[in-house]
Amino acid sequence: MHLTRLNIERVRNLKTVALHGLQPFNVFYGANGSGKTSILEAIHLLATGRSFRTHIPKNYIQYEADDAIVFAQSATEKIGMQKLASGEQLMKVNGDTVATQGQLAKLLPLQHIDPQSTEIIDHGAKPRRQLLDWLMFHVEPEFYFAWQYYSRALKQRNTLLKTRRNLSLADLEPWNKMLSNYGEILHSQRLSIVEQWNVYFQNDLSQLLPDLEIELEYSPGFHTEQGLMQDLLNQHQKDIERRYTEYGPHRADLRLKTLFGHADDVLSRGQKKLLIIALKLSQIAMLHASNKETVVLLDDLTAELDLTAQQRLIERLSQLGSQVFMTTLDRASVKKHLHDLSISYQLFSVESGQVSLAAP
């Protein structure tokens, strides 16, 4: 879904934003603190139901306002989100209220590329697992169903472990069965997708880091040779002592291995940034191969990447048919890249929360 229209109300310092005629590349420039990143934040809120800067709605809803609203339109769809300061939200697709955020996310596959962040590599398994599951959600039709049932069983089992001290295997049996059943399904799905993803990843890695050999290695979170049920049975007493479930797909990881060790241990900060970009580009490529359009948020392109990396990234996103919303302090460099690559774009000036169309 590519956006032709975007409306934003009461997000941070932004005045009422009404953008029309959006292009494949949409560039927002202005001083620090002008509100550039808040535009990306609003699009992220629409697609995911949350900000990438804070978990607290009051922090991005304007002072003394009760809500924030983001609306977008494509050639075929209209989607909208009202986020209340309480955290509640109202979502609509083509005028009809929808019950889950997943319905918006399916329509608006969204990748956020922040060249300044190395969180996916440096901050443990969770962000890597989330990266993998973003791809799963968009390319594996049965994943969301299996994950919902697995998560429900995990929550119930953990509640028992936390609230009851004299648990028997019989008490845990119904949740063990459900966890084992859906956990094995999730493992099989993830394993298959990682194998496919690795092909796309190697292609983008060779363009950004041609001198490095890195493999995606999926760690399932349990001992696959004996199965998840056996792990749950063997560990039930320790789980009672820990008061949570140790083994299962919720503990999975996506390891990035080089010839010299794990990426987080051996790569420089600059290499880590390019590696993360390669991971996300390869996911976009996999969706593109399935005829799915991705919207990409690219924050502060020129801050951390050299000119060659900037141009390679812009060119690759254009090849993949992505619609890009990017921020920059250096509009001259970005304009040159876009002109050199003959890419259609729209330029917007952002000043004290006011967004206006600028001359290309």
UniProtKB/Swiss-Prot annotation:
Gene Ontology CC: cytoplasm
Instruction: Report the InterPro entries cross-referenced here.
Output: DNA-binding_RecF, P-loop_NTPase, RecF/RecN/SMC_N, RecF_2
List where in the cell it is found: Cytoplasm
Query: Which SUPFAM superfamilies has this protein been placed in?
Result: P-loop containing nucleoside triphosphate hydrolases
Presence of the UniProt keyword Nucleotide-binding in the record: yes
Give each disulfide bond as a residue pair.
none
Which UniProt keywords are present, listed alphabetically?
A: ATP-binding, Cytoplasm, DNA damage, DNA repair, DNA replication, DNA-binding, Nucleotide-binding, SOS response
UniProt superkingdom: Bacteria
Q: Which GO terms describe its molecular function?
A: ATP binding; single-stranded DNA binding
Provide a GO biological process annotation.
DNA replication
Provide the binding site for ATP. G30, A31, N32, G33, S34, G35, K36, T37
Is Nucleotide-binding among this UniProt entry's keywords? yes
> Which coarse location class applies to the principal site listed for this UniProt protein?
cytoplasm
Q: Which NCBIfam families match?
A: recf
Q: Which PANTHER family match?
A: DNA REPLICATION AND REPAIR PROTEIN RECF
Tell me which family the UniProt entry assigns to this protein: Belongs to the RecF family.
Function per UniProt: The RecF protein is involved in DNA metabolism; it is required for DNA replication and normal SOS inducibility. RecF binds preferentially to single-stranded, linear DNA. It also seems to bind ATP.
Protein name per Swiss-Prot or TrEMBL: DNA replication and repair protein RecF
| Species | Acinetobacter baumannii (strain SDF)
